[in-house]
Amino acid sequence: MRLSIYRYDPDKDAKPYMKDYEVALDSHDRMLLDALVKVKAQDDSISFRRSCREGVCGSDAMNINGRNGLACIMKVADLPEHVTLRPLPGLPVIRDLIVDMTQFFKQYHSIKPYVINNDPPPERERMQSPEEREELDGLYECILCACCSTACPSFWWNPDKFVGPAGLLQAYRFLADTRDQATAERLDDLNDPYRLFRCHTIMNCVDVCPKGLNPTKAINHIKELLVKRAV
């Protein structure tokens, strides 16, 4: 297969460029990350992130033939012979396929991604019924790969103001958690023209999520909570 890979080293390159690599790979059970590792063996100057190789850590997210995804779970057999790889859009490029995730994680941390409960700690865990626990399905599985937020035009335009699909999915994860006591505080923080309401239900986030999650649905639930509180 042939990989056209975005290359950019700010220490020596005046501007980015694309470079082609030929890789011989048995496509039967191989993933795109395997091809990238082979490219790295040919040219050790190329840079990309990787870790778990199992679609759990989210570190090898990149733009694959114009669509964000994880290289480690993208089957070579499902790809054309010519594959174009670029860094995730909308974030500053550090080098080659590595982007600066600072703004993404700044927005994530801004929603206070942890249970806030001021009751005295129980002897064991804070209890939930099976039904209450099921409300978190489709929310907690997010691996923070940033595929969704970097596919969102609203995040491209206002990354410093709009929380983004990933952050808002996690915001609703804690709003939906019956153990959390900070509902009013969380809604006050999100009731803003930019932080929440820059979402225009374009739904690119749903299309690219490698875990099959639905950030748009979670965002709409937050909007519903704000409307119910207002009336």
Predicted regions and their residues:
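Ferredoxin-type iron-sulfur electron-transfer modules in oxidoreductases and energy-metabolism complexes
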Residues: 29-43, 86-231
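Short, structured protein-protein interaction patches enriched in aromatics and acidic/basic residues
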Residues: 52-61
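Short, contiguous acidic and Ser/Thr-rich linear segments
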Residues: 19-30
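A generic structural motif
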Residues: 75-76
